[in-house]
Structures are given as structure tokens and as C-alpha cells.
A protein has these predicted regions:
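Sec-dependent signal peptide recognition
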Residues: 1-10
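N-terminal, active-site-proximal structural segment of metallo-dependent hydrolase catalytic domains
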Residues: 17-90, 100-108, 184-187, 201
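Active-site beta-strand/loop signature of hydrolases that rely on acidic residues for catalysis
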Residues: 24-29, 57-80, 146, 157, ...
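Second-shell loop/turn segments in exported
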Residues: 42-48, 65-73, 100-101, 132-133, ...
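Structured beta-strand-rich core segments of catalytic domains in phosphoester-bond hydrolases
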Residues: 74-162
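Metal-dependent phosphoester-hydrolase catalytic domains
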Residues: 138, 188-203, 209-296
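Metal-dependent phosphoester/phosphodiester hydrolase catalytic core
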Residues: 150-158, 162-184
């Protein structure tokens, strides 16, 4: 009997009776839409993402099994619903809630989210403006904000997809200045809406299209001496940090991140930040999913 009591005591220490674990993931699913594309060596116009790629993406999601999945590069709502339906039919646990945010009118790639947790509120911020070469421009994909409540604790997720490195401007190589200004504008919006001194609890996820030590990432981490976010150290099974493979130049880079506010960081489960590197993952997308667990 004494042995049983001791065993129960240690189990309660290891697995808190009243805790709730939430897995949050971010995944750029690479052109999950209709577009002109190369398929099996042939150029196809207005062609959907091949089913073999879709199947691999579903397989990655099933294996990670996130409770909340932030998506980038999803097409119109039809494609989100298609993915949503297929995932729910696979028996991994129903995603009961979804959210889709439309970007600019001519933007094909949008933000979306699937969740097993109830969504308390959801907002799309499409009017984030900034000055770029003396012209006021908007973030093309906007910023998604979703609010959750777990074990009585209210927290928020922001999903973003910053400007890619493709540009026609020779005076802004790789759109570095544009991306920095877009990041700064989003940072300022979050900071203004949820001031650091109020100890906001949130996570910022997505495809930042830049490296760890670049200005767009730094904008989200700190202002002067005020820490805004911590970058979670997502790694794959071999300990590598890269999340994106660029086949044209055969390069591997870290472009996808999970950034948590100091208050959110208290719920992060140490060592749970991972990169999904399962077999054939790059056949579904050129990005690898990043995810982490939180205990509330």
C-alpha cells in the first residue's frame, strides 16, 4: 500500500492533475491552391496542388498532431475546407474550429488556422500600413489574431507571413527593407494593442522569410531594454535548426519561427520545440513544420 501511495505521488509530480497541455504548430504548406506549376516535368496552367503533395502534408500534420495549427500559403476557403475535411476523416482527433484570412485582392496565398480548442475571438488585421520609399503600403497578407482560453488563462496567437525575398526593386535587394518595415509595423501594432507592461500572453508564429539575426526578427524580440518575445529553439531529430529548403540553389535556411512573450514563455515545456523532419517531408512543402508544447 505504501509503495502504491509513493507511486501515485510521483505520478502527480510528473503529470499535474489540473494541467492542460496544448501543442501549437506553424506550417507553410507551399502553394496549397490553383496556379500555373510544373508537374511531373510538364508545365500546367491553373493546376491544383498535386494530391501526392497534399497527402504528405496531411501525413506530417497527423504525425505532429497539433492542437492548434497555423497555416501559410493556403488558397481560397475551399482549399482550407478540403484539408480540414481530410484531416478530420483521418481519425487524428477532430479540428472543430477554423479561421481563414484573405490578403490583398490580388494575393493568392493566405493565412489560416485549424484548432481543436474553442476560439474565443478572432480578428484579421489587414490595415497594417508603413512607409516604403515615400509611399504608404500595406502588408499584403495581413496579420491574424486568435484568442484562446485554457484553464482560465486567456492567451493569443498571431499568425503572419512576411514578404518574400523576391523583388523587382534594385534599390532594395531581396526586399530586405520592405520586410523590415512590415515586421516593424506588425510589432508596433501588437505592442500598442497589448503593451509589454501589461504582461500580455501571446505567441507569434509563421514564415518570417528571414534569418535569426536579421532586422525583421530583431524587431519582434526587443525594443531598447524591453524584451518583447523569446525565440523558441526549434530543432529537428538531428539537432538542426533549418526549416526551409531552396532547391534552386540547394540551400537550407531557418525562416519559420515561434516567438513567445515573457508571460507565454512561462507555460512553454522545455525541450518541446521541434521541427518535423519525417521521411519525405520536403515532397509536400519546401518548409518543415515547427511546433512546441505549452502546459497551462
Amino acid at each position: 500500500m505504501l509503495v502504491l501511495v509513493k507511486l501515485l505521488f510521483f505520478l502527480l509530480l510528473a503529470f499535474p492533475l489540473f494541467g492542460e497541455r496544448v501543442r501549437v504548430a506553424s506550417y507553410n504548406v507551399k502553394n496549397y491552391l490553383v496556379m500555373d506549376r510544373l508537374v511531373a516535368g510538364y508545365w500546367r496552367e491553373d493546376y491544383p496542388k498535386p494530391e501526392i503533395e497534399n497527402g504528405i502534408i496531411r501525413s506530417m500534420i497527423r504525425r505532429v498532431s497539433p492542437d492548434i495549427l497555423a497555416l501559410q500559403e493556403i488558397g481560397e476557403p475551399y482549399y482550407l475546407n478540403d484539408l480540414w475535411r481530410d484531416l478530420n476523416a483521418s481519425g487524428i482527433g477532430h479540428y472543430k474550429h477554423s479561421y481563414w484570412v484573405r490578403g490583398e485582392n490580388d494575393e493568392q496565398r493566405h493565412l489560416a488556422l485549424l484548432s481543436r480548442l474553442p476560439i474565443i475571438s478572432k480578428k484579421s488585421h489587414l490595415n497594417i500600413e508603413f512607409l516604403y520609399f515615400n509611399e504608404t503600403v500595406r502588408s499584403r497578407r495581413g496579420l491574424m489574431e486568435v484568442e484562446f482560453r485554457t484553464k482560465g488563462k486567456t492567451w493569443r496567437l498571431f499568425n503572419l507571413h512576411l514578404k518574400s525575398k523576391w523583388t523587382e526593386r534594385k534599390d532594395d535587394p531581396q526586399a530586405a527593407d520592405l520586410r523590415e518595415k512590415e515586421a516593424r509595423a506588425m510589432r508596433d501594432f501588437i505592442r500598442r494593442t497589448y503593451p509589454p507592461e501589461t504582461n500580455p500572453t501571446h505567441i507569434i508564429v509563421g514564415d518570417f522569410n528571414d534569418f535569426k539575426n536579421t532586422a525583421p526578427l530583431r524587431r519582434f524580440l526587443k525594443v531598447n531594454k524591453t524584451v518583447l518575445s523569446h525565440m523558441l529553439p526549434c530543432r529537428d531529430s538531428l539537432g538542426y535548426f533549418w526549416t526551409h529548403y531552396y532547391a534552386k540553389q540547394d540551400s537550407y535556411d531557418r525562416l519559420d519561427y515561434l516567438l513567445v512573450s515573457p508571460s507565454m514563455n512561462k507555460y512553454y515545456l522545455e525541450g518541446s520545440a521541434r521541427i518535423a523532419d519525417y521521411l519525405r517531408c520536403l515532397e509536400g512543402s519546401d518548409h518543415r513544420m515547427v511546433y512546441a508544447d505549452f502546459e497551462f
